[in-house]
Each structure stands twice: as C-alpha cells, then as structure tokens.
C-alpha cells in the first residue's frame, strides 16, 4: 500500500512528460508545414521553364525532320492551332469585356488564325510543287 502514492506520483510525471512531448511534436509539425509551403515552386517560373523547354523541342523537331515530312508536319501544326483557336474563344467568352483573360484570348485567337492561314498557304504551295 505504501507504493500506491509513489506510483501515482510517477504516473503524473509520465503524463506531464507525455503532454510536453505532444506539444513539442505539434510545434514541429506546424513548423514543418510552414517550411514545405514556403519552398514550393513559383507557378510563373514553372510555366516559363516549360515554355523554354517546349521551344527547344519544337525547334529541333522542325529542323531535324526530313523534307518529305514537312507537309504532314504543317497539317499537324494547323490542327494544334485549331485547338488553340477554340480554347482561346472559350477564354474570351468566359470573362467580362475587358479582363486580362479575354484580352489574352483575343491575342491568342489572332495569332493562331494567322498561323492556320499561313499554314494553308504554305501547304498549298508544297502540294503544287509535287504536281509539276
């Protein structure tokens, strides 16, 4: 019976130590979550990186293709530009009159349309060369 108060005192110390460790662990988890949130990649840097890599890949694909495959490459480029035109028109209609997305969508529609019409002209000239 004399050991009961000693065991109660030890249990209280263990509970106190467990509570202290729990509080420290909670602080560590909060600090870790703050550190992971501050080390994320900026979306603008990510988008610019993808743009630069896509530019290099596109450059090497276009310049390394054999001349016999230029016409199919032009048709694929026209198809991709058609998808861009549709997407940019959706961007124009999904916002109000003078928001950034509508202006960017209008600019994308203009550039993709120029690309499509230029592609058709170049493809027509290439096909006329094969007729001769």
Swiss-Prot record:
EC number: 7.1.1.1
Cellular component, GO annotation: plasma membrane
UniProt-listed InterPro entries: NADP_transhyd_a_C
Catalytic function, reaction form: NAD(+) + NADPH + H(+)(in) = NADH + NADP(+) + H(+)(out)
Domain of life: Bacteria
Role summary: The transhydrogenation between NADH and NADP is coupled to respiration and ATP hydrolysis and functions as a proton pump across the membrane.
Alphabetical UniProt keywords: Cell inner membrane, Cell membrane, Membrane, NAD, NADP, Translocase, Transmembrane, Transmembrane helix
Keyword Mitochondrion: no
Keyword Transmembrane helix: yes
Protein's GO biological process: NADPH regeneration
Positions of transmembrane segments: 43-63, 72-92, 103-123
GO molecular function: NADP binding; proton-translocating NAD(P)+ transhydrogenase activity
Locations listed in the record: Cell inner membrane
EC main group: translocase
Organism (species): Rickettsia prowazekii (strain Madrid E)
Protein name: NAD(P) transhydrogenase subunit alpha part 2
Membrane topology type: Multi-pass membrane protein
Subunit structure: Complex of an alpha and a beta chain; in Rickettsia, the alpha chain seems to be made of two subunits.
């Amino acid at each position: 019976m004399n050991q009961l108060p000693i065991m109660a005192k030890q249990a209280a110390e263990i509970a106190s130590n467990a509570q202290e460790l729990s509080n420290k662990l909670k602080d560590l988890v909060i600090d870790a979550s703050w550190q992971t949130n501050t080390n994320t990649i900026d979306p603008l840097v990510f988008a610019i990186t993808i743009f630069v890599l896509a530019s290099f890949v596109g450059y090497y694909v276009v310049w390394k293709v054999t001349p016999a495959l230029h016409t199919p490459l032009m048709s694929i480029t026209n198809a991709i530009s058609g998808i861009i035109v549709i997407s940019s028109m959706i961007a124009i209609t999904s916002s109000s009159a003078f928001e950034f997305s509508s202006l960017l969508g209008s600019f994308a529609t203009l550039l993709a349309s120029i690309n499509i019409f230029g592609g058709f002209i170049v493809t027509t000239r290439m096909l006329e060369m094969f007729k001769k």
